[in-house]
């Protein structure tokens, strides 16, 4: 599972994210995507919306069972 918490998401990026994620609250997106899709999506966002603030919580195969990344 992946959770994205974003600030001021541009409409084009928000629409793209809704392909794979549901948005229970504005700018909070939750979905189950594989590692490759998640990394490609984050790369696309960083390239096309470099000023977007984003917190990413994702399940991982580590001792905690999840990872936390922050951008912007």
Language model regions located:
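Basic nucleic-acid-binding interfaces
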Residues: 2-22, 26-72
